[in-house]
Amino acid sequence: MKVRPSVKRMCDSCKIVKRRGRVMVICINPKHKQRQGK
């Protein structure tokens, strides 16, 4: 899980979702998991 100030899709299977008020990227590739920090 990468924590970044700005999250972007890294491939076509990445999906941007909002969970508990945080923007996250979920993907079939575990390296592409991201969460938006403060």
UniProtKB/Swiss-Prot annotation:
It holds the Pfam family Ribosomal_L36. It comes from the Bacteria. InterPro entries: Ribosomal_bL36, Ribosomal_bL36_sp. One of its GO terms (molecular function) is structural constituent of ribosome. Keywords: Ribonucleoprotein, Ribosomal protein. One of its GO terms (cellular component) is ribonucleoprotein complex. One of its GO terms (biological process) is translation. The keyword Ligase does not apply. Belongs to the bacterial ribosomal protein bL36 family. This is Large ribosomal subunit protein bL36. The gene is rpmJ.
